[in-house]
Amino acid sequence: LGDVYKRQKLYEPEEENPMLGFRGASRYVSDNFRDCFELECRALKKARDEMGLTNIQIMIPFVRTVSEAKRVIELLAQNGLKRGENGLKIIMMCELPTNALLAEQFLEHFDGFSIGSNDLTQLTLGLDRDSGIVSHLFDERDPAVKALLSMAIHACRKAGKYVGICGQGPSDHPDLAKWLMEQGIETVSLNPDSVLETW
């Protein structure tokens, strides 16, 4: 049990604010997480190459910088998961303001965006959506958030790449879902109980 706990502490360090800490692409490119990342890559490669599940795509979350994007793509290729090979597509979660602001540069390394509107809104407005004090300010329809959403969508459309959105916003606000469609979004995730109203 002690050894298991040590490994857990290595891969899941305690942080004051894990939401902004060791997660996403930063974890994948870290030497401390390398064994786990390689194991995940082997599992994906086996599913695609040996089991014939070539419909499996890869999605990379929380990519902070363009250099981090480049590095994670390189590591995937080194582990036998090369973008474009055997139809492999690698999508990036667009959930940081920097992702929308530098969308064209990030898209050089990926086959499209899945926009994570929850994190994008939280980080754009600088608030904790789980806070009982400021969570009432959380709104994906805020003009600043919509400006970033528009930038990300238009960059994908311009590049001829996929763009979809996941997050609570379209389920809570049918007007936002309509606006997203007008902007050119390809897919929208919805809660089951909101499909008819949003449709």
What are these regions (language model features)?
Residues G2-W199:
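Conserved alpha/beta-domain cores
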